[in-house]
Design a protein with these regions (language model features):
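NAD(P)+-binding Rossmann beta1-loop-alpha1 motif at the extreme N-terminus of oxidoreductases
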Residues: 1-50, 117-118, 180-182
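Hydrophobic packing residues within well-ordered alpha-helices of enzyme cores
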Residues: 5, 9, 30-34, 67-71, ...
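Small-residue helix-packing motif on alpha-helices
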Residues: 20, 30, 48, 64, ...
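Rossmann-like NAD(P)(H) cofactor-binding subdomain of soluble oxidoreductases
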Residues: 21, 37, 45-122
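Internal alpha-helical scaffold of NAD(P)-dependent oxidoreductase catalytic cores
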Residues: 93-103, 119-157, 169-206, 251
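Short pre-catalytic strand/loop immediately N-terminal to key active-site residues, enriched for Gly-Thr
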Residues: 105, 154-159, 211-216
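NAD(P)-dependent Rossmann-like dehydrogenase/reductase catalytic/cofactor-binding core
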Residues: 194-258
Length: 258
């Protein structure tokens, strides 16, 4: 995900490869990052901390403390900005490892950022400035939609857009299975289902109409669509999706307390 965000920023001309430096304790991961972005690779966290003033923290949650403590020791009192995509790590936790000279922003991107169609949200820490928020928005906007929200809403963001791609994949798979059931070749069914969901989403974003209005526009009295919708309602699909988002949101809250 970190590579996707950096590559998006480079493609959008927000960053130049010559200004990007990276480090990963796994050498192969560092090499892959360099190949994807054209960035320079540092041999240690200490070297990285001396090379940049803005840091994208794209590590596993269990590595966050060690990485930030190292950064704090290496930077001293020199100002810096940390933008974290580490799942479940709160702003308070991030800030607790850092001196007051280092500002923090917490983000929740999703996997469609890998193809430039992400939906991300971010929250700013107590020491972050308006310029910091603008920098985070530019970075996240380079790979899709970016919204600033209060941190208390990031768990809901996780349940909705963070986990949402998996719900979408399941829906596409189910639609394709239904097409296969009625005679469509598998690959054709998948492409039709995926393009249909893409088209529906694009209509919502580009028309600014409520999804219910768009649904009504394609639902003729006594037609095929209303029969399909009635079957969805009868089988609780709407409720199942609401419960899926709620379950993922509650799990995100639990993980942030571990």
């Amino acid at each position: 995900m970190g590579s996707a965000l950096i590559q998006g920023a480079i493609n959008a001309k927000i960053l130049q490869p010559s200004t990007v430096f990276g480090y990963d304790k796994i050498i192969a991961a560092s090499e892959s990052f360099a190949a994807a972005t054209g960035a320079s690779i540092c041999s240690s966290l200490e070297e990285l901390s001396q090379s940049c003033d803005t840091f994208l923290l794209a590590t596993k949650p269990y590595d966050v403390a060690a990485v930030l403590k190292n950064l704090a020791a290496s930077r001293g009192d020199r100002p810096a900005l940390v933008i974290s995509i580490a799942a479940g790590i709160t702003l308070a936790s991030l800030e607790s490892y850092l001196p007051k000279s280092i500002r923090v922003i917490r983000t929740m991107p999703n996997t469609p950022a890998l193809v430039g169609k992400g939906a991300s949200a971010f929250a700013v820490g107590e020491r972050a400035t308006a310029d910091d928020a603008n920098a985070a928005e530019k970075l996240l906007s380079s790979v899709g939609l970016a919204l600033q929200v209060p941190e208390k809403l990031l768990d809901a963001v996780t349940g909705l857009s963070g986990s949402g791609p998996a719900y979408g994949f399941l829906i596409i798979e189910a639609l394709a299975d239904a097409g296969v059931r009625h005679g469509l070749p598998r690959q054709d069914a998948i492409r039709l289902a995926a393009q249909t969901m893409l088209g529906a989403a694009t209509m919502v974003l580009e028309t600014s109409l409520h999804p219910a209005q768009l649904k009504d526009m394609v639902t003729s009295p006594g037609g095929t669509t209303i029969e399909g919708l009635a079957a969805l309602e009868k089988n609780g699909v709407r409720h199942a999706l609401i419960e899926a988002v709620s379950a993922a949101t509650h799990r995100s809250i639990e993980l942030s307390k571990i």
